[in-house]
Amino acid sequence: MSRLQEKYNKEVIPALMEKFGYKNIMQVPKLEKIVVNMGVGEAKDNSKVLESAIADLQQITGQKPVITRAKKSVANFKIRQNMPIGCKVTLRKDMMFEFADKLMNIALPRVRDFRGVSAKSFDGRGNYALGIKEQIIFPEIEYDKIDKVRGMDIIFVTTAKTDEEARELLRYLGMPFAQ
């Protein structure tokens, strides 16, 4: 069991039960999955770019990414239907907790002039989205080996019914929200 999962079981569940007055332990919101998505627009011209993005994402998450493809053809973006335009990874259970722990305690503090993540990026359904501008904040990525600085989107999907519950869940888990 990972460090974050133990913290969730021993500290977060009792704290949330007290704060929101849950009667049953199953009502307490929990992390369901984390989706890490990397949109690689340049992949339409050069397939090598997508391969290096996949390699980066695999190193960061420890899981093989799936290639995302264009749903429709868009002439303005010069893409056709089913062209590869990015990659994503869905993390659940142990891998999810390991990644969340690494993100909150190691990667985010390495961001330049980091003052905390926005507390407004909730979607109204208890999910939290976070954008990262460069992949080099993760310790697995070697600075000399990257071909291009790429960003990524990280979505925390929770079982929380409201944004307030999700915010408290992530705050107790150690997400550094800006004040």
UniProtKB/Swiss-Prot annotation:
SUPFAM superfamilies (alphabetical): RL5-like (SSF55282)
Listed GO CC annotations: ribonucleoprotein complex; ribosome
Biological process per Gene Ontology, one example term: translation
Alphabetic keyword roster: Ribonucleoprotein, Ribosomal protein, RNA-binding, rRNA-binding, tRNA-binding
Gene3D superfamilies: 3.30.1440.10
GO molecular function annotation: rRNA binding; structural constituent of ribosome; tRNA binding
NCBIfam families: PRK00010.1
Function of the molecule: This is one of the proteins that bind and probably mediate the attachment of the 5S RNA into the large ribosomal subunit, where it forms part of the central protuberance. In the 70S ribosome it contacts protein S13 of the 30S subunit (bridge B1b), connecting the 2 subunits; this bridge is implicated in subunit movement. Contacts the P site tRNA; the 5S rRNA and some of its associated proteins might help stabilize positioning of ribosome-bound tRNAs.
Family: Belongs to the universal ribosomal protein uL5 family.
Quaternary data: Part of the 50S ribosomal subunit; part of the 5S rRNA/L5/L18/L25 subcomplex. Contacts the 5S rRNA and the P site tRNA. Forms a bridge to the 30S subunit in the 70S ribosome.
Protein name as it appears in the record: Large ribosomal subunit protein uL5
